[in-house]
Amino acid sequence: IIFNWDWYAGDIMHMLNVREGGLAIHGGLLLGIGVGLILCYVWKVRPFNILDLCAPAIALAQSIGRWGNYFNSEAHGGPTDLPWGVWINGQTYHPTFLYESIWCFILFLILLYVDNHRKFEGQTILIYGILYSCERFCVEALRTDSLMLGPLKQAQVISLVIILVCVILYVILNKKRGANKI
């Protein structure tokens, strides 16, 4: 929506038409976290505790959800001769959905461990943000259907911003943990 504002500005309700696609994980995560933060404020609960609780489930849901890209024959990489390439319309392509699905499942396992051994509130969600965004930056380089933002793909730019924000928050919250032990 942000990158096609001129198209959406004339018909705001068109933004809600999910049947036409255009859904992206970064937008979904930002909306979900935004709504979650509002609910935390309303319910007077500590947001990083809730985000930490949700992080492993988000990674698992992404691992499963990426298979939708396979069934829709979308969000794949460029042509490949690798034996695990997926066959779409007479050509084999990098199965970027599979790369991301496998990584998100591994991330799910990592986050379960981190959450059970976390040192401060926010550690689990911040590690999710860093590791998922690193993976997404790399896999995005293989995809052929991405929006560009200068020399990088839009999702790569967003991933870099998320990594930067999460690393800064990680350092800040980790320094505060001495005063605020869990």
Q: Language-model segments: which ranges?
A:
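A feature for loop-to-transmembrane-helix boundaries and adjacent hydrophobic helices
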Residues: 1-182
